[in-house]
Amino acid sequence: MGGGERYNIPDPQSRNASKNQQQHNRQKTKDQNSQMKIVHKKKERGHGYNPSAVQNGGKTKSLSNNSNWNASLSSPSLLFKSQASQNYAGAKFSEPPSPSVLPKPPSHWVHVSLNPSDKETMTFQLKTLLKVQV
């Protein structure tokens, strides 16, 4: 109850002035951001300022490049020919791995004295469990 709290009561005119200033600053920031976005988009598209294009009356020399590009696209098999000739060294997932590659189970997991019929049953059960539904 001792020290009373002090409240700063702002002058209503200065409050309105600061609001107007804030709005003005926000508008400036928005304008600057929109200009930056436009410049950035132009750079992404590759339409930056080109003085030679202005001198040529807006005509660019990209027409000769486009004809080369279209010629290479007319035969897409040429694009993928080098990739198709390369062999993939990894495992093919459509084929099951060979048993020699698979790790051996610990000796305490499998009872050593199994009958051949029990082995066949276990093999069949394991294969049905490991089958991948396509």
UniProtKB/Swiss-Prot annotation:
Biased composition (Low complexity): 62-74
Cellular component, GO, one term: P-body
Subcellular location, principal: nucleus
Highest rank taxon of the organism: Eukaryota
Region: Disordered, residue numbers: 1-74
Biased composition (Polar residues): 11-24, 52-61
Cellular location(s): Nucleus; Cytoplasm, P-body
Pfam families linked: PNRC (PF15365)
Keywords: Activator, Cytoplasm, Nonsense-mediated mRNA decay, Nucleus, Transcription, Transcription regulation
Motif SH3-binding: where in chain: 94-100
UniProt entry tagged with the keyword Coiled coil: no
A Gene Ontology biological process term: nuclear-transcribed mRNA catabolic process, nonsense-mediated decay
Domains: entry comment: The interaction between PNRC2 and nuclear receptors is dependent on the SH3 binding motif.
The family this protein is said to belong to: Belongs to the PNRC family. PNRC2 subfamily.
Subunit structure: Interacts with UPF1/RENT1; preferentially interacts with hyperphosphorylated form. Interacts with DCP1A. Interacts with many nuclear receptors including ESR1, ESRRA, ESRRG, NR3C1/GR, NR5A1, PGR, TR, RAR and RXR.
Functional description taken from the UniProt entry: Involved in nonsense-mediated mRNA decay (NMD) by acting as a bridge between the mRNA decapping complex and the NMD machinery. May act by targeting the NMD machinery to the P-body and recruiting the decapping machinery to aberrant mRNAs. Required for UPF1/RENT1 localization to the P-body. Plays a role in glucocorticoid receptor-mediated mRNA degradation by interacting with the glucocorticoid receptor NR3C1 in a ligand-dependent manner when it is bound to the 5' UTR of target mRNAs and recruiting the RNA helicase UPF1 and the mRNA-decapping enzyme DCP1A, leading to RNA decay.
Protein name: Proline-rich nuclear receptor coactivator 2
Source organism: Rattus norvegicus
Name of encoding gene: Pnrc2
